């Protein structure tokens, strides 16, 4: 999700996934590769041993006019690639992991470049579970000199669990004294519908 944070509790969603979230795509590809859950950290570790150019996976919506993303086609391309391989050994798994990680990162970088061009923002915060991925962090850090921006990340200890990040934001929005709050519960709640 790409969000323009104008002020505390003032958000505008500029782009989002049309299907799988980035972390969800990592988890699903991890499962296809027989890796433990969650897949993200295991793909990152395996990718270190692989060639990111071994497989030319698609970069869905990378050139679209909007800032939305779609990763289900990429995930499906990985599935079809795996199904064609008779002996899925560790070296091949590493190449698939590295190529997948690069494809996802290429899409993220392209969308952020487009965001900066459109919004003229100079600060980018990379957050969520995949913000712990060192490859993704490095690629975003490389944008600083190219786009004259500053990239920020939460400490790694806050990246592994979206619930912790959400709870932290909730604590910032809540008054210090205890309250009896009545609220509806929704599995998916658009960020721009939250109010203080």
Predicted features and spans:
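Active-site metal-binding loops of divalent metal-dependent hydrolases
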Residues: 129-130, 136, 156
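A short glycine/serine-rich beta->alpha loop
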Residues: 12-17, 63-66, 150-159
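Glycine-rich phosphate-binding loop plus the immediately following alpha-helix
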Residues: 5-51, 75-76, 80-86
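A contiguous, well-structured pocket-lining segment that forms one wall/lid of small-molecule binding clefts
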Residues: 45-124, 133-147, 174-177, 192-196
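Beta-strand/loop-alpha-helix module characteristic of Rossmann-like adenine-cofactor folds
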Residues: 1-3
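Conserved phosphate-binding/catalytic loops in two-lobed NTP-binding clefts
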Residues: 124, 141-165
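Glycine-rich phosphate-binding/hydrolytic loop that grips phosphoryl groups
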Residues: 154-195
């Amino acid at each position: 999700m790409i969000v323009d944070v104008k002020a505390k509790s003032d958000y505008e969603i500029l782009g989002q996934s049309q299907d799988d979230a980035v972390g969800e795509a990592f988890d699903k590809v991890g499962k296809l590769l027989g890796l433990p859950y969650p897949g993200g950290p295991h793909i990152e570790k395996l990718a270190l041993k692989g060639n990111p150019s071994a497989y030319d996976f698609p970069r869905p919506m990378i050139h679209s006019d909007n800032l939305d993303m779609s990763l289900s086609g990429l995930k499906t391309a990985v599935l079809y690639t795996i199904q064609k391989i008779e002996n899925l050994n560790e070296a091949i798994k590493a190449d698939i992991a590295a190529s997948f990680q690069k494809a996802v990162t290429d899409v993220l970088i392209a969308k952020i470049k487009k965001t900066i061009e459109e919004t003229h923002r100079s600060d980018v915060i990379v957050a969520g579970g995949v913000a712990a991925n060192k490859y993704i962090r490095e690629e975003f850090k490389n944008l600083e000199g190219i786009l004259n921006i500053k990239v920020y990340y939460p400490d790694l200890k806050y990246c592994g669990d979206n619930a912790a990040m959400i709870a932290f934001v909730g604590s910032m929005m809540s008054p210090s004294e205890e309250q009896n709050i009545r609220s509806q519960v929704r599995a998916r709640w658009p960020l721009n519908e939250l109010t203080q």
